Amino acid sequence: MDAMTSPSPYIELDRTQWRTLRKSMPQVLTEDELEQLRGIGDEIDLEEVSEVYLPLSRLIFLRVEAHRRLNAATETFLGEAMPQIPYIIGVCGSVAVGKSTTARVLQVLLQRWETNPRVDLVTTDGFLLPTAELERRKLMHRKGFPESYDQAELLSFITKVKSGTQKVQAPVYSHEAYDRIPDQTITVDRPDILIVEGLNVLQTGPTLMVSDLFDFSVYVDARREDIEDWYIDRFLRLKNTAFKDPEAHFHHFANFSDEEATVVAREIWQTVNLPNLMENILPTRVRASLVLRKGPDHLVQKVRMRKI
């Protein structure tokens, strides 16, 4: 692994090198279970789980164990027991890159460690400002950009979880309604591990940010041309499935031809998602603990892991 001695904060491993680091981590997923976790257009299969995600699961296991030893050292120093501090993992990347699938697969793999940790998953979609508020602020065209989130609410949520607060509530988002679901929340009650998945979770700022509270982070990466293709493909699939629901926010696209829908999807990508990727998401890649680099087939080709 020559990359370990290169002048870079990252170790770069190709897939062949990375898969050997799985060691004895057992395969704990079935094809039926993976089907339930797979996102629209994502090509992840059991081989991908074995060669990419099981080594990652092993790495996180080792990091969590080190985290616990560090907490024990703090208790020894203070001479008193400390409340359990959840290990928080951020998962970041562009729209359509497959970060949601990555987060869901990781959640299941981590839950099935021999130590049986409680692993919760929260997406930052629930912390988007309600549609009515976005319209009031004239930000609907900026949905997904940092300013479209209730950053204070998100930071408060993560801070409470990190400090060991019981039964912390997180808002819930509906992709069908394209809005928060009023009066509906999920409860996060002192998990061993919390996975936070979202577009902008690695953002930095002049004051405390969500990313400052992460113990580990994963950035799902790919060429922007590939992500554009995946976004358009996903849009076409949704046109023929979820958009057909009369209650769906994008129902008006359901009767578009594939050619018409492709034009719409490409315009949305080029005017909203690509600028957000280039201005806000991609610049945070350097802050990730680990980068999963995908090829055109949606499968991971190489991994970059921070040395420090």
UniProtKB/Swiss-Prot annotation:
SUPFAM superfamilies: P-loop containing nucleoside triphosphate hydrolases. One of its GO terms (biological process) is coenzyme A biosynthetic process. It is an enzyme of class 2 (transferase). It holds the Pfam family PRK. Signal peptide: none annotated. The keyword Metal-binding does not apply. Keywords: ATP-binding, Coenzyme A biosynthesis, Cytoplasm, Kinase, Nucleotide-binding, Transferase. Its EC number is 2.7.1.33. It is found in: Cytoplasm. One of its GO terms (cellular component) is cytoplasm. The keyword Transferase applies. Its main location: cytoplasm. GO terms for molecular function: ATP binding; pantothenate kinase activity. ATP binds at residues 93-100. Pathway: Cofactor biosynthesis; coenzyme A biosynthesis; CoA from (R)-pantothenate: step 1/5. It catalyses: (R)-pantothenate + ATP = (R)-4'-phosphopantothenate + ADP + H(+). InterPro entries: P-loop_NTPase, PanK, PRK/URK. Belongs to the prokaryotic pantothenate kinase family. This is Pantothenate kinase. It comes from Corynebacterium jeikeium (strain K411). The gene is coaA.
